[in-house]
Amino acid sequence: MKNILITGGVRSGKSHFAQELARDSGELVLFVATAAAGDDEMRQRIEEHRRSRPAAWRTLEVTTHVGDRIPQRIGRAKIVIIDCITLLVSNCFGQYADANEERIDVALVEQEVTREIGELVECISRLEAGFVIVTNEVGAGLVPPNQMGRLYRDLLGKANQLLAQQVDEVYLMVAGLPLRVKPSQYPGK
C-alpha cells in the first residue's frame, strides 16, 4: 500500500476514510492513537474511536515519540494508521507550556515538533508498511488571537507540509468526501 496523508477540518470524515482505506486493503493494521484523555469529553471521543475499529487491529496509544515506538509494536502489520498529527503536535506543546498555557518556550517547542516529525518521517522511510496519516488543516481558519495559537498553527502547517512531501497521496476531506490533492491532476504540479 502507498503512504497517504489525509487532511481536512474537524469532523470532516478523516478518520473514517483512513479506516476505510485500511479495511479495504485486507492487511493487518496497527492503529496509532495520539490522543491524551484530558477530560470526560475527550475520554468519550477516544472510546468512540476505539469502538469504530475492527477488533483484529492492534492499537498503540502513544502521545509522543511516535516514530520510535511504531517499529517496536508493528509486528506483522502491513498498514499503520496514525490518528492524528494534530494531537501529536499539541502533545509536544504540552511539555513546554506553563500551567495556564499562557507562556511557552518557543525554541523548545519548535525543536520538539521538528524532532517528532523527523523521527516519524524516518520511521515511514525505514519500515515496509503503508502509512495512512490523519491530520487537521488549520491554515484555512481565522488567525489565532494569541501567540500560542499562532505558533501551533504554524508548526502544524510545517509538519503537514513535511509529511505531504514524503507520502505518495494526499487527500483533503470536505463534508465526508475525499478530494485527491497529490498526485495532482494538473501536469507539472
For the regions a protein language model found, what residue spans apply to each?
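Structural motif
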Residues: 5, 81, 132-134
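Catalytic phosphate/metal-binding cores of nucleic-acid and nucleotide-processing enzymes, i.e., regions
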Residues: 1, 75-76, 111, 118
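A basic- and aromatic-enriched beta-loop-alpha substructure that forms the phosphate/nucleotide-
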Residues: 73, 78-96
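Short, well-ordered beta-strand core segments
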Residues: 29, 80, 169-172
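Residue-level signal for inorganic ion chemistry
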Residues: 18, 49, 81, 136, ...
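Conserved P-loop
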Residues: 2-74
